[in-house]
């Protein structure tokens, strides 16, 4: 299959599984294989793991381009998500992309925000006042029609007030908007996203607050990154995924692949987590009731941890027999 999702609990060897998968594909002559981590720190961990098990790999040197060992499909290239997913990617965008045999996203849930941010431009009023002011002026009349008071608060720099530019105003003024962004494209806040937005401006929306302006797509165009989108094999690995829907609408995965991830059949805990606010479920479940009930529960089959804001807040738990540190 082209796409594969692997869910393994933390500590079950996801990294080694991923490295072995890519090495197997290299041995099968599937083409260059790319291992993508959420950040630079985890790149070092994966490299250490590969070195420990004798799996050949290569990394980016600071002053060189894409390693020849990767392009020749001799070694796995290990890098971080920001290196691949940005408008100035060394792997190319649009039609000028580097062909790959397999791309693996490790801790894929942690990579999602980075991929989304690659398509987003955030213009700070403090760091880039000129561009911010031009955009604010461009849509000033449209904002007044929505809410004159809110528009005045934004002009005054209120952090908590924001407005969305109506899509019809955005579409009518997209040419003027492109001229503003093009003139400022060398700015660090615009530079990396500009190649992705310049020909897709119609598919973006704009949010304006008193401190910044954010321009984001309705949905990311993952096909702009051909090295990932058109790889022969795409593998996502994670202990848990909070936003599986993004794999379909964002990464263009088949829904059936997302519904049927590869799991360890003997695994008792999936790694998925649930956050519950008891008082929103049942009004009678106030703080004192929850603390009392939980402290009286048997912990022979599972552990229980309570995080409190201060030492003073520990006393209620101490009185009920909890161990505090």
Provide a role label for each language-model segment.
Residues 60-61, 81-89, 209-223, 324-325:
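Short linear interaction motifs
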Residues 63-77, 315-325:
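Conserved motor-coupling elements within RecA-like helicase/translocase cores
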Residues 85-86, 91-100:
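Phosphate-binding/switch loop-helix module in NTP-utilizing enzymes
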Residues 12-62, 83-86, 243, 305-315:
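Conserved Walker A/P-loop ATP-binding site and its immediately adjacent core
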Residues 62, 72-87, 108-109:
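P-loop NTPase motor core
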Residues 2-5, 9, 96-102, 107-321:
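Conserved coupling segment at the C-terminus of the helicase ATP-binding
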Residues 57-59, 258-259, 322-325:
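Short hydrophobic/aromatic-enriched beta-strand-loop microsegments
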Residues 20-22, 62-66, 88-92, 220-224, ...:
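A generic local structural motif
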């Amino acid at each position: 299959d082209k796409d594969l999702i692997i869910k393994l609990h933390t500590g079950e060897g996801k990294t080694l599984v991923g490295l072995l998968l890519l090495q197997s594909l290299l041995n099968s002559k599937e083409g260059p294989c790319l291992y993508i981590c959420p950040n630079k720190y985890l790149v070092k961990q994966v490299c250490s793991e590969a070195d420990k098990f004798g799996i050949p790999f290569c990394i980016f040197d600071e002053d060189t381009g894409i390693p020849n060992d990767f392009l020749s499909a001799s070694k796995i290239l290990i890098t971080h998500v920001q290196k691949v997913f940005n408008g100035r990617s060394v792997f190319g965008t649009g039609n000028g992309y580097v062909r790959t045999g397999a791309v693996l996203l490790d801790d894929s849930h942690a990579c999602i925000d980075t991929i989304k941010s690659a398509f987003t431009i955030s213009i700070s009023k403090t760091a880039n006042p000129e561009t911010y002011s031009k955009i604010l002026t461009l849509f000033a009349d449209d904002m007044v029609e929505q809410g004159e008071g809110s528009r005045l608060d934004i002009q005054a720099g209120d952090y908590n007030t924001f407005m969305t530019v109506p899509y019809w105003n955005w579409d009518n003024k997209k040419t003027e908007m492109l001229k503003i962004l093009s003139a400022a494209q060398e700015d660090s806040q615009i530079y990396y996203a500009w190649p992705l937005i310049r020909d897709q401006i119609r598919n973006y929306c704009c949010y304006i607050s008193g401190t910044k302006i954010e321009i984001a797509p309705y949905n990311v165009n993952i096909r702009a990154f051909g090295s990932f989108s058109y790889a022969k094999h795409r593998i996502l690995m994670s202990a848990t995924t909070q936003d599986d829907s993004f794999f379909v609408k964002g990464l263009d995965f088949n829904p059936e692949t997302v519904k049927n991830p590869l799991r360890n059949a003997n695994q008792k805990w999936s790694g998925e987590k649930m956050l519950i606010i008891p008082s929103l479920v049942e009004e009678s479940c106030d703080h004192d009731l929850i603390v009392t009930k939980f402290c009286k529960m048997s912990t022979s089959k599972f552990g229980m941890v309570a995080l409190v804001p201060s030492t003073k807040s520990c006393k209620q738990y101490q009185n009920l027999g909890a161990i505090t540190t």
